[in-house]
Regions:
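Ligand-binding clefts of soluble mixed alpha/beta catalytic domains
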Residues: 1-341
């Protein structure tokens, strides 16, 4: 959208695969200021009703452009990852970025203090082809990161958690964003790379009012119904029902040594499972810490690998190589999936 859009044109805008509107000049409206004033007796400008600052936060627009030129450049970037139509696959481009490139920074990017946040986008930039990441819907459902990138020239979808917002928990908004993105990838047969640091669904009264369990379950269903190849890299946390949204059918699962998983995060799980034991202890706080340290050993990636629920535990510096080789292997699978159209 480059200017004011209301009614049916606004509906066409939100029905698009990629939605971008220009800052200040574009507004998306169900009805304009005159209709709103007549109905509610309230005077508002088009920008106050449906400007980019409103719609980048509620998910109506995926991206905001600084100018018309920027809008067209974003559209061009988005289309570069897609095939010509749904009966073809996206093209691989020439790549001078070696698949065995190792970034030492990946060894220290995850804080030793598991409660501290870090920049997941930095991991994306270090692992995938240089300058290839195109993010969508950044300001809606901020705990979830979605976008496209390339690995050894192959286009892939990026689905990740941002620990800077709600520790990466999946909110109702994040779940809606997830469902739509996975279905977009299904439509155009773009394989998904999931970088997991998922503590679970967002909890609390606001989360319940937002219908988090409803939208979260729909996100999990979108994953289970997905028809594209998935690879999941367990970066750190992978807990609860929400974690299921990060593991596609027959996916290729890798884990960093920093990965931890289970039905509940350590702190909440210990508090619930050992409530009486902690309360009856002479020093409840010391008992709680003792139990948490004991249970933490069971949440490491090594028991999962021994049970074959993780294909490999990898050196973080080799993440690029593993994903690149996977992207090469799945090309025949993607071609076969077109036969079912």
């Amino acid at each position: 959208a480059l200017g004011p859009v209301a009614g049916m044109p606004a509906a066409r805008f939100v029905a698009s695969h990629f939605r971008v509107m220009t800052k200040e000049t574009a507004q998306i409206l169900v009805a304009g200021p005159a209709v709103v004033e007549r109905a509610f007796g309230k005077k508002m400008t088009k920008e106050e009703l449906g400007g980019s600052e409103i719609h980048k936060l509620n998910g109506v627009t995926d991206n905001v452009a600084d100018s018309e030129e920027d809008a067209f450049l974003q559209i061009k970037s988005f289309l570069s990852y897609l095939p010509q139509n749904i009966y073809e696959l996206s093209e691989k481009v020439d790549c001078n970025d070696p698949i065995d490139r190792k970034e030492e920074e990946l060894l220290s990017i995850i804080p030793k203090d598991r409660k501290r946040s870090y920049e997941m986008r930095d991991i994306v930039k270090l692992v995938f082809d240089k300058d290839s990441f195109f993010e969508m819907t950044k300001f809606f459902g901020k705990g979830i990161i979605t976008g496209f990138a390339r690995i050894n020239g192959f286009p892939v979808a990026i689905f990740a958690n941002d620990s800077n917002f709600y520790a990466g928990s999946m909110s109702a908004e994040g779940a809606q964003k997830t469902s739509r993105f996975i279905r977009l990838c299904d439509t155009f047969r773009i394989p998904i790379v999931s970088l997991v640091d998922e503590p679970g669904f967002l909890i609390g009264p606001d989360a319940e009012r937002a219908g988090t369990i409803l939208h979260g379950t729909e996100a999990v269903l979108a994953t289970t119904e997905s028809k594209v190849p998935w690879t999941t890299i367990m970066i750190r946390k992978s807990f609860g029902v929400a974690a299921a949204a990060h593991y596609g059918p027959d996916g290729y699962v890798l884990a960093w040594p920093s990965a931890e998983s289970g039905p509940l995060p350590l702190e909440g799980g210990v508090a619930v499972a050992f409530k009486k034991e902690i309360a009856s202890a002479k020093n409840p706080e010391a008992k709680r810490k003792e139990l948490e340290e004991k249970m933490a050993k069971n949440q490491s990636p090594f028991p999962r690998a021994e049970a074959f629920s993780v294909h490999e535990i990898i050196d973080p510096r080799e993440t690029r190589k593993y994903i690149a080789l996977w992207a090469e292997r799945i090309q025949s699978q993607l071609k076969a999936s077109l036969m079912n159209r």
